[in-house]
């Protein structure tokens, strides 16, 4: 199994972060949560959010916050399916990397 550690990894992380908030979450918080595990700039992340929305993996809605409109993102049903695919691929990819780095075969949980 080959897991694209560029675009696919960032997409998987973004979808996972958004999935943690069932009512949705906003761009700045997504950026902060993603930055806990990888370096990413807002100028990189916002186009990813727009692309995931265009691909029907994310839904958006606007809500007023402190006198301004804030755009919220939440997973669509297609987004849940895609996230599940990414998670399955990641498990296989991680097992292969573990075998190489640790020198032993790992059990898939």
List PLM regions with ranges.
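Amphipathic alpha-helical dimerization/coiled-coil segments
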Residues: 84-109
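N-terminal helix-turn-helix DNA-binding core of bacterial DNA-binding proteins
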Residues: 2-44
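Short, hydrophobic-biased segments on the C-terminal half of alpha helices
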Residues: 49-51
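Beta-hairpin "wing" of winged helix-turn-helix
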Residues: 55-69, 74
